[in-house]
Design a protein with these regions (language model features):
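ABC ATPase NBD Q-loop/coupling interface
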Residues: 65-81
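H-loop/switch region of ABC-family ATPase nucleotide-binding domains
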Residues: 202-203
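Catalytic Walker B motif of ABC-type/P-loop ATPase nucleotide-binding domains
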Residues: 167-170
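The feature captures the beta-strand-to-loop junction immediately N-terminal to the Walker
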Residues: 36-38
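Conserved ABC ATPase signature
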Residues: 142-146, 150
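Conserved ABC ATPase "signature" region
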Residues: 120-138
């Protein structure tokens, strides 16, 4: 399913400036879209509006059109139709716990049970989802006793079990170690291959660069740049916005201030690309 924004503005009740301003964009099925921007640029709000959580859960006021297919996710009348089709992972995963589950198994099974799945289907789907995020060994643990990284994997599994058509991910790997983080991004890439629209809001440029098809750079609630991640991140326009880049990209930019000749031929974003460029020099 495609998510479409057309001239959308959104303001929280107590905020002075709008979080989104006349924003238009779309997220396609089968594609990983990366939302990137400085703190307060609007990435988290864009995710919330995509799923209808803003304004239904957050309050505030939205103008313009948001559509998932032909449905407005911000219309509470459409919640039942969209239930199970949207997988949202918050930057604060502990807030997504049901508060009713005694074990990790029960937590991941919570949504399928509420959707009326039979027990056999639930059992198989829960164990498969936990295995895919490397959390099968946590199945009998108490959710509130998990570490940050363990909890993040369980929350991802709780969405994964539903095989959502749309993934809305807010810093979904922030608490994970490097190896597990790479596995999480690879999983989201697999979900896009399955046909899901995957939208990831993160500052983790090093991690998401390898899996993103597209990057949208936000600035003060508007789309500032939109294109292929390697092209956008290496551009002077992106650097001028002050949103940062990969670790290698930032180091290379800093080096060019001392040695301007290094800027010739573009900015490498990975260690492999930087090494190749140095060897060619």
């Amino acid at each position: 399913m495609m998510v479409r924004f057309d001239g959308v503005s959104f303001s929280y009740a107590c905020a002075g400036a709008p979080a989104l301003r006349d924003l238009s964009c779309s997220f396609a099925a089968g594609q990983v879209t990366w939302l990137f921007g400085k703190l307060g640029a609007g990435s988290s709000t864009l995710l919330l509006a995509s799923g209808g959580f803003a304004p239904i859960l957050t309050g505030g006021h939205r103008t313009g059109s948001v559509r998932i297919g032909e449905l407005d996710p911000g219309d509470i009348a459409n919640r039942a139709v969209l239930a199970g089709r949207i997988g949202y992972v918050s930057a604060q995963p502990h807030l997504q716990l049901s508060g009713l589950a005694e074990t990790v198994f029960d937590e991941v099974a919570f949504a399928p049970a509420n959707l009326g799945w039979d027990r056999e289907r639930i059992d198989a789907a829960v164990m498969h989802a936990l295995a895919r995020v490397g959390a099968g060994h946590l199945v009998r643990r108490v959710p509130n006793e998990l570490s940050g990284g363990e909890l993040q994997r369980v929350v991802i599994a709780a969405m994964l079990v539903l095989a959502p058509e749309i993934w809305l991910l807010d810093e979904p790997a922030s608490a994970l170690d490097p190896a597990t983080r790479a596995g999480a991004y690879a999983l989201f890439r697999e979900e896009a291959r399955r046909g899901a629209a995957v939208v990831i809001a993160t500052e983790d440029a090093d991690g998401v660069l390898e899996v993103a098809d597209r990057i949208i750079v936000l600035d003060r609630g508007q789309v500032a740049l939109d294109g292929a991640p390697a092209d956008v991140l290496a551009s002077d326009a992106c650097w001028a916005l002050g949103v940062g880049s990969t670790t290698v990209g930032e180091l290379w930019r800093a080096a060019t201030e001392r040695t301007p000749a290094m800027a010739l031929g573009g900015v490498p974003l990975t260690l492999q690309a930087a090494t190749a460029k140095v060897l060619r020099a």
